[in-house]
Swiss-Prot record:
Belongs to the universal ribosomal protein uS17 family. CDD domains: Ribosomal_uS17. The keyword RNA-binding applies. SUPFAM superfamilies: Nucleic acid-binding proteins. InterPro entries: NA-bd_OB-fold, Ribosomal_uS17, Ribosomal_uS17_bact/chlr, Ribosomal_uS17_CS. It comes from Parvibaculum lavamentivorans (strain DS-1 / DSM 13023 / NCIMB 13966). HAMAP family: Ribosomal_uS17_B (MF_01345_B). This is Small ribosomal subunit protein uS17. One of its GO terms (biological process) is translation. One of its GO terms (cellular component) is cytosolic small ribosomal subunit. PROSITE patterns: RIBOSOMAL_S17. One of the primary rRNA binding proteins, it binds specifically to the 5'-end of 16S ribosomal RNA.
Length: 78
């Protein structure tokens, strides 16, 4: 099974080697036929501490690094 890759904006980089990425998805509501935006935050492992708040990054699934971190930084610029 291929690893999932998501793109989002870094909202926090205060932790050591961890960033929080806000990923937004858009879909059409089946009943109202209206475009709806939903967002979710993911904790991602950033080994080089290269991502800063406001950067657009791509993250990919990996084996669990800790309780919350199951994603890693794939590329810094999307």
């Amino acid at each position: 099974m291929p690893k999932r890759i998501l793109q989002g904006v870094v909202v926090s980089d205060k932790n050591e080697k961890t960033i929080v990425v806000n990923v937004e998805r858009r879909f059409q509501d089946p009943l109202l036929k209206k475009i709806v935006r939903r967002s979710k935050k993911y904790h991602a492992h950033d080994e080089n501490k290269s991502a800063k708040v406001g950067d657009i990054v791509k993250i990919r699934e990996c084996k669990p690094v800790s309780k919350l971190k199951k994603w890693e930084v794939f590329t810094d610029e999307a």
